[in-house]
Curated annotation (Swiss-Prot):
Sites where the protein binds (S)-2,3,4,5-tetrahydrodipicolinate: H160, G169, T170
Highest taxon above the source species: Bacteria
Function: Catalyzes the conversion of 4-hydroxy-tetrahydrodipicolinate (HTPA) to tetrahydrodipicolinate.
Residues forming the catalytic site: H159, K163
PROSITE patterns for the chain: DAPB (PS01298)
Keyword DNA-binding: no
Identification of the protein by name: 4-hydroxy-tetrahydrodipicolinate reductase
Keyword Transmembrane helix: no
Lineage, top ranks: Bacteria, Pseudomonadati, Pseudomonadota, Gammaproteobacteria, Enterobacterales
Catalytic activity: (S)-2,3,4,5-tetrahydrodipicolinate + NAD(+) + H2O = (2S,4S)-4-hydroxy-2,3,4,5-tetrahydrodipicolinate + NADH + H(+); (S)-2,3,4,5-tetrahydrodipicolinate + NADP(+) + H2O = (2S,4S)-4-hydroxy-2,3,4,5-tetrahydrodipicolinate + NADPH + H(+)
Main EC class the enzyme belongs to: oxidoreductase
Organism: Salmonella schwarzengrund (strain CVM19633)
A Gene Ontology BP annotation from the UniProt entry: diaminopimelate biosynthetic process
Amino acid sequence: MHEAQIRVAIVGAGGRMGRQLIQAAMAMEGVQLGAALEREGSSLLGSDAGELAGVGKTGVIIQSDLASVKDDFDVLVDFTRPEGTLAHLAFCRKHGKGMVIGTTGFDDAGKQAIREASQEIAIVFAANFSVGVNVMLKLLEKAAKVMGDYTDIEIIEAHHRHKVDAPSGTALAMGEAIAGALDKDLKDCAVYSREGYTGERVPGTIGFATVRAGDIVGEHTAMFADIGERVEITHKASSRMTFANGALRSALWLKTKKNGLFDMRDVLGLDVL
């Protein structure tokens, strides 16, 4: 057993992402699985987290009460749903725990609650924890600065049939990266649906298209299209483990932070490129 630098609690431990996070925590140098949680009434309560995730017995028992494990972790890793994440945020703020938030679908009030909590605790909040996706966001900023003023920009994303929000948080982050590079607000230039007689494409807009099908882990493409040529920047994920590893890497990075709101570009040092 390697020496732990950070102890993590994983909420939603029985879900697809939760199990991957448990596997990643058990494998990553410097990380210790301190707690695993599921909703009250879940049939998984009382199970060993490692056995649930297929990595063998860990001695960490899945529980529903966050307060009962507050001394067992330093950073909470949350890939659940907005209402649950905000409740966990209030707990972590009260008890001085760091957070890694991969939940998507927050409204403006939820995002504001995260910003306010970050004045007291350290939070990494990202739409996508894949290293590749965050490199892509940096590439999109650079492409937008060169081509954004004269091309038609479209973002196409595809996910599995169980995803409940659209467009994906990553697609929105792509739009925000492009809009920011063009000194625009995404709210003012995004087009989220087209149906019926729409008229010609409005110049300067950023279009979004969504696919939900099968077991697609996540595919995102940004298109910069002109007459005679187009540039497409694409990322395809084939395993959730890429997100889990990025989230645990973020938890390790938080060990030296007392407070503040960060994203994966901070963790990876991409803003200096």
